[in-house]
Every structure is written in structure tokens, then in C-alpha cells.
């Protein structure tokens, strides 16, 4: 890697964290006073989502004009189709919480390099927790290095499972809800980061979008966690050049809990 490439690497890592912090401060300016509307798919969007995304995208384009940018809101997709670096923005991950004046939302910024998680920052402006990571450089919560637990799934495990299940609750999820303790925080990015810090033991999300995952994926992976599609196949690299990457079912955990859960998902699927 050339000196110029190393400089760009460090600058992207720093910019992701800096923009997550700035986006979080802007989110607080709208908190409890945001204007809420519904998107065609029925999900919510606020004026904060749009304002934060616009601000972040402008700063990224100014700093790295050759990078591509995609975002959750308003069909954002800019930059070269085959760019080496692709920024993935979720300006308010947890809009349902944010719109109701509840905590449990974050600003999530991910950077993919050749479709693989490269750098990420997830900021919770209520707790002032900044989760950040860069490939090969570790993961951090503010100034504290992160490692997942290695605890197996047990009766006391805390797991997160997205609801509702439009086609009925799969048998493995029914079993988990009987055996484990459910926590659903409303921000997929934060939940993956909670696995990275050892707070959550498992996350199953049957409808995760790329912008839900891209900012937190480097944090989880650099902390020693595992993130795959629910069938165990790799989540990355992402080969879709634009924003039309479809929602997917994902499984995230520490190495032990992920292996246990994947075996249960596989057994349940085979037996159906």
C-alpha cells in the first residue's frame, strides 16, 4: 500500500467517526420536535433523517469525490459505479424510536472497500457512545477496546429477534423465545455493537438492509464477532454497485453463540 493509500485509509476512518458525532449532534437538535411522514413502504422518515443524510453526503463528497455514497433515504446513490470505496449511510437507525421521542437510535456510517467492511462508526447521541472500527485496527467504544464474549447460549442469554414475522414465527425463533431473554432496542446497528461489547449474545434479523449493517459490521468483526446470512453464507462482499441490495436475513453473535444458533437454524430449516 502506497503512502497516499495509507493516508486515505486513515482519513476515511477518522471522517466516519467525525461525521457520526456531527450527525448525532444534529439529531439531538431535532429530537422531540421532528416532523414525521411515512414512506411508500409504510416505514417512517423524519426531517432529521433527510437533513442528516444530506449533511453527511455533502461532507463525504467534498473529502472523497471519487468515492460512491448510498443512503437509506430519498434513493441516495452517487459516485462512480465501480468505486473502490463505497460509503453506506443510515442517518437515523431506529427512526421509530426517534420519532416517538424514545432513546435507542443511532447515526450509522459504514465504508466498504471492494464490497468488504472497511471502516464503520455508530454513534448513540443519548448515551454518547461512539462505536468505531477499521479493518485490521480493532474496534472501540469511545476509548475502550472491544471484544465479544465467548459465552454459549444459555437460559440467561440476551438475544434480539426482529418482529413482526409476516409469514409466521419460524420454529427456531419460537424455541429461542422460550429459552432465552429477548431484548429489542430498535436500532440494528446498535444491537450489533452490543454484541461486539458482550452485552447481547445473539442478533437475528430476517429483514436487514445494507445500511442497517454496514456501519456496525466492522465493529462486530474487529471485536471478534461473526456476521453471516442466516443460512451461514457470507454477508460480504456486497457486489451490488448501487443501493438496490435487497433486505436479507442475518445472524450475528460471538463465535460460540453464532455457531450454536446457526446449527439450530439449519436443523429447523432441514426438518420443515
Show which residues each predicted segment covers:
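Acidic active-site catalytic centers that drive phospho-/nucleotidyl reactions
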Residues: 49, 53, 72, 90-93, ...
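N-terminal subdomain of lithium-sensitive/metallo-dependent phosphomonoesterases centered on the IMPase/IPPase/PAP
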Residues: 1-92, 263, 270-272
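Acidic beta-strand-loop-alpha-helix segment within the catalytic core
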Residues: 109-193, 239-272
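Residue-level detector of anion-binding/catalytic polar loops
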Residues: 66-68, 181, 201, 226
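Short loop/edge segments at beta-strand edges and connector loops
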Residues: 71-73, 143, 186, 231
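Residue-level signal for inorganic ion chemistry
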Residues: 27, 49, 60, 95, ...
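Oxyanion/phosphate-interacting regions
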Residues: 1-13, 18, 193-272
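Glycine-rich active-site/cofactor-binding loop and its immediate structural neighborhood
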Residues: 83-121
